[in-house]
Amino acid sequence: MNMKKFFAILLICAMVLSLAACGTQNSSADSTGQTLAATRTVTDRAGREVEIPIEVNTIVCLGSGAPRIAAYLQVVDKMIGAEDCDTGDVTVLRDYSWVYHDELKDLPSCGKGGGSGQNNAYPEQIIQLQPDVILAGFSAESADELQLQTGIPVVSVYYSSINFVDESFYEATRIFAEVVGAEERCEELLNFIDECKAELDERTADYAEGDKPTCYTGAVTFSGRHGFCGTYANFGPLMAVRARNVADEIKDVNYFETDFEQVLVWDPDIIFLDPGNMNLVSEEYVSNPEYFHSLRAVQEGRVYTMPSFNNASTNITYCLMNGYWAGMVLYPDAFGDMTMEDVADKVLSFMLGKNYYEDMVAGGLYYGTIDIGG
């Protein structure tokens, strides 16, 4: 350990001990003999039992997904610090950050931010802020580390990006709501998501497997940006509408890099691509235009956008919207009464209180066709 890091840890420990000592002195000086504030225990997503105050009025939200849940639960007003990724320049790639930027941009910095699940918080600043609770999209080890660094309860609300709004998000949101007293809004939110999922399922339930077009989603974003061969098996928005995703034949995986020859063997009826990564696909096209023109979906003009919904964990809003979009493309008869403008208004207005679909389109998150090489 270098000396700079050693002295930084000493400083943090000294601050924590100083605050604890002040609390002890104040308690001892209390002639009425009143006990310290009552607490309660919550079990977080990592299975840790965390003792927190009965009433939680101020919070800091860190890491993968935690600030987003605060926005969905409409408790951003309890946040007294924000991460660097939400206070600087923001884009529509992160739903909550775009909507709540005015509220977050002037809050004190309390961490770097991002979706790593690791502890990249700024403990000294958090100690100065003294929130009642820290809610973090951290692993158990990272949550323990930050709690030791600050002396403040850390509740893990990490959720995964696998499949289509899976149970981990429900659990994380309910734990978050329990901490901040937002149980009513929480159940409204989760019921809304359930209704969307049920609608997608019901509209596609009567299609025989052989009557469905095959499809492939490429140029996806996972651990960075990828070109045409970056894909997903068990891709949430496609699963939600019972799609025939050709990549699903690769078992027990989620995102992976296939190869050009395999996609040609699959030769899907419909191709979805992330518009945010089309510069990579365009470079591949320039290198081998004949390959792309040999694909039936390209020949027939059946290549569509599928905007990325992962940025510092999953944008649940965009994930739901992508499910509706997949349904519209794959089953036009079943979704002919819908437009993406209507879907965006429904999802964004309920979950974030603002329909900013025009901003999404302007920022590159649009729903439509793609002309590869055009």
Model-assigned labels for residue ranges:
Residues 4-12:
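Sec-dependent signal peptide recognition
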Residues 18-21:
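C-terminal motif of bacterial Sec signal peptides marking the signal peptidase cleavage site
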Residues 23-25:
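Bacterial signal peptide processing site
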Residues 49, 143-223, 247-248, 305-372:
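Extracytoplasmic substrate-binding proteins
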Residues 58-63, 78-83, 133-137, 154-158, ...:
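Structural recognition of the beta-strand scaffold that forms the well-ordered cores
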Residues 67-125, 133, 246:
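A short, structured surface patch at a secondary-structure boundary
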Residues 115-118, 122-136, 260-276:
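Proline-aspartate-enriched helix->loop->beta-strand connector
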Residues 227-254:
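Alpha-helical, coiled-coil/dimerization segments enriched in small aliphatic residues
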